[in-house]
Amino acid sequence: MSNLINIKNRINVVTNTRKITNAMQLVSTSKLHRIINLTKNIKAYQNLVETTFDNIVSKITQEELNEIFPPKQETDATLYIIVTSDIGLCGSYNSNVINELKKVIKPSDLVITLGTKGLNWIRVSKFKDQLYKAYVNLEDKLDYSIATEIGNLNFELFAKNKISSCKIIYTKFVNNLIQEVSVKQLFPYDSSHLEIKKESEQMEGDIEFEPSAEIILQRAFPLYVSSMIYVLVSLSKVSELASRRVAMESATDNADEIINDLNLEYNSKRQSVITQEITEIVAGAQATN
């Protein structure tokens, strides 16, 4: 009888867990459907920002670009911005980002974390002294003011010779089932792809800049960095919801299988107990006769 009680308790525990995973799956699906409609607009905005900036950069030489943002000889430190979630139960979403950071981080680098999971990890890791700033309790859609603040921090650190570059590690949204960890350099601007664009005739025609491309670039670059942070973090949030939906769907399916197996085991043992009790009753009746 004690075995039956234990099995029944396990069924209740798994059933309660299934209710949680199923609820989180439904919530993630609802949020994903809502936010995925914004993805096209976000990607269109990203394409507009990148194309506009490419057009500006294409009008100046690499030497002029180096004069505006001179390469730092005093340090080779990189500021890494990592995008993680505030809550778990989203598969390997957070661990993939953290593992990517582990591959590339150097002792002189600095880290800005977005999301509670990234902060919790770095606080207990050997990289805890490299944490520069953390942002937690973010909404499904990043507040643009936070992106602007991070962009300004980047240029402050660069001006103080604390860093020579800035990169963001985020999760690229491919589709509902595929999300890929990516690293994008935000600063200095990587213009290596411009020649390829020119050869494929994707660049715009002649554009006149007033007062000059150099001055516009100098003023526009902080906007570019902030915009890219906003876009990439927003796309990461889509990936987070997709990862959580898949993880919770898998967990719910696994719970259903476990419940079915436990029910079969419970019914089998219960049948054995009943059969044994009937046998004992019959044997007792025969003994009295």
From Swiss-Prot:
InterPro entries reported for this sequence: ATP_synth_F1_ATPase_gsu, ATP_synth_F1_gsu, ATP_synth_F1_gsu_CS
Record SUPFAM superfamilies: ATP synthase (F1-ATPase), gamma subunit (SSF52943)
Superkingdom: Bacteria
Disulfide bonds, paired cysteine numbers: none
Main location: membrane
GO-annotated biological processes: proton motive force-driven plasma membrane ATP synthesis
Keyword vocabulary terms for this entry: ATP synthesis, Cell membrane, CF(1), Hydrogen ion transport, Ion transport, Membrane, Transport
Subcellular location: Cell membrane
Family designation: Belongs to the ATPase gamma chain family.
Functional summary from the UniProt entry: Produces ATP from ADP in the presence of a proton gradient across the membrane. The gamma chain is believed to be important in regulating ATPase activity and the flow of protons through the CF(0) complex.
Assembly description: F-type ATPases have 2 components, CF(1) - the catalytic core - and CF(0) - the membrane proton channel. CF(1) has five subunits: alpha(3), beta(3), gamma(1), delta(1), epsilon(1). CF(0) has three main subunits: a, b and c.
NCBIfam families xrefs: ATPsyn_F1gamma (TIGR01146)
The protein's name: ATP synthase gamma chain
Organism placement in taxonomy: Bacteria, Bacillati, Mycoplasmatota, Mycoplasmoidales, Metamycoplasmataceae
